[in-house]
């Protein structure tokens, strides 16, 4: 929590403002991740998990870290408007992650969380033919706070369902290819 007050040019202080708090700080280091990396042997897989919540969350954030592109869906609706996310990463040094406030997307009861993955930069090759990863991979960590402040953490693990999407290729510097006949 934090608060502020203002001093005017005569040195007179205002009253303290109402206490406030940072909404979230994110995951500061690799040790903060409880999620496991998951993938499916396809260039553009769909990954899905159902989670059941006892009540509508007071706050909920999801952190997503991926090799390759991803799009997040909750209860059939896309979260965020980003395309080809995350942006360019130097995969031998770091991977970028994004945080979404998903409070408004979750409901009491069953919630379907879906992740579409695309090859993107995970399929990058160098001049010697080295490839970063044969298939895109992701780890996601959903932190849900109830009205009393208790936090439940839901993570990617081997219980997620996986399947191949109709997108045949989504890589760097090439147009997407859609295989609608599948």
Give residue spans per PLM region:
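N-terminal pre-domain segments of enzymes
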Residues: 23-40
